């Protein structure tokens, strides 16, 4: 069986089944005493191209996608650890620009590694502390589904041959974490990520697509592209965040447009969902 057949989630399930990794349920791992840790990698030709992004923007993006996982954990960031693989002919000034971007969010870089590679690859580990991590598995029938901002920016940018700048939702994440029953960031597309809440919580997520706020220039199908890095939460009180749906008894995700079923795509690292 190949990765293209099972996808990322299938691989994770097989690792868990064989006892090779603990069950991976949330955006960041909880290590006790409120410490949470997450890691994401960006690989040239897979996640970015230098005709679409500068070295500085790449650095910011690498920090931001990891901080998004901390935001989904209601965490206050404390440190970043950075591993960089680059060709030997890379200009030193380009690497300095990359690190300038990594430093933009204001989280200290406390360690890492640098090594040689044919293409650029960047892996960031982010550490933070959270008083309460809602996770993905606590949503209940009757909960409302809310998002922290407009969706579709990344998909719209891709259609225009560019990359969107990820938002930082750390403040919103800490606010939502105080009372949300489930919380995650939208990195794989709205339908896919709502499906994570539905599967872990044992509920059916019903999303009214006409209520989903769209980013400037975005079309509805862009919401399925992923990499918006807004937060999706299941709550009792929307607290001013955009309400886009609800949780019901049942399973799976129902996407409705004017009351009729609608399909959105989503992202899987080894296949399109």
Where are these regions (language model features)?
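Glycine-rich anion-binding loops of enzyme active sites
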Residues: 42, 76-155
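Acidic, Ser/Thr/Pro-rich beta/coil linker or hinge segments at domain junctions
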Residues: 3, 7, 33, 166-167, ...
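Active-site glycine-rich loop that binds ribose-phosphate moieties when present
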Residues: 124-135, 159-175
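Extreme N-terminal cap/leader segments of soluble proteins
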Residues: 1-54, 73, 78, 82, ...
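Active-site-proximal betaalpha loop/short-helix elements
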Residues: 89-91, 164-228
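Small-aliphatic-rich amphipathic alpha-helix that forms the alpha element of a beta-alpha
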Residues: 55-79, 96-104, 171, 175, ...
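General beta-strand structural signal in soluble alpha/beta enzymes
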Residues: 23, 36-39, 108-112, 126, ...
């Amino acid at each position: 069986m190949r990765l293209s057949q099972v996808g990322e989630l299938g691989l994770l399930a097989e690792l868990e089944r064989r006892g090779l990794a603990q069950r991976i349920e949330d955006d960041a791992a909880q290590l006790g005493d409120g410490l949470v840790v997450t890691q994401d990698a960006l690989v040239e030709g897979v996640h970015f191209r230098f005709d679409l992004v500068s070295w500085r923007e790449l650095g910011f993006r690498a920090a931001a996608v990891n901080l998004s996982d901390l935001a989904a954990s209601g965490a206050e960031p404390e440190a970043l650890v950075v591993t960089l693989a680059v060709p030997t002919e890379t200009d030193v000034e380009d690497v300095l620009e990359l690190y300038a971007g990594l430093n933009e969010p204001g989280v200290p870089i406390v360690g890492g590694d640098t090594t040689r590679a044919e293409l650029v690859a960047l892996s960031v580990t982010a550490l933070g502390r959270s008083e309460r991590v809602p996770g993905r598995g606590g949503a209940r029938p009757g909960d409302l589904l809310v998002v922290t901002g407009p969706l579709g920016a990344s998909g719209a940018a891709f259609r225009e041959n560019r990359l969107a700048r990820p938002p930082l939702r750390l403040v919103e994440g800490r606010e939502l974490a105080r009372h949300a029953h489930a919380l995650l960031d939208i990195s794989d597309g709205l339908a896919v990520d709502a499906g994570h809440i539905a599967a872990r919580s044992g509920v059916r997520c019903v999303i009214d697509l006409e209520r989903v706020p769209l980013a400037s220039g975005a079309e509805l199908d862009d919401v399925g592209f992923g990499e918006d890095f807004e937060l999706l939460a299941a709550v009792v009180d929307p607290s001013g965040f955009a309400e886009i749906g609800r949780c019901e008894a049942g399973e799976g995700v129902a996407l409705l447009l004017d009351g009729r079923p609608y399909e959105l795509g989503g992202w899987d690292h080894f296949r399109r969902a």
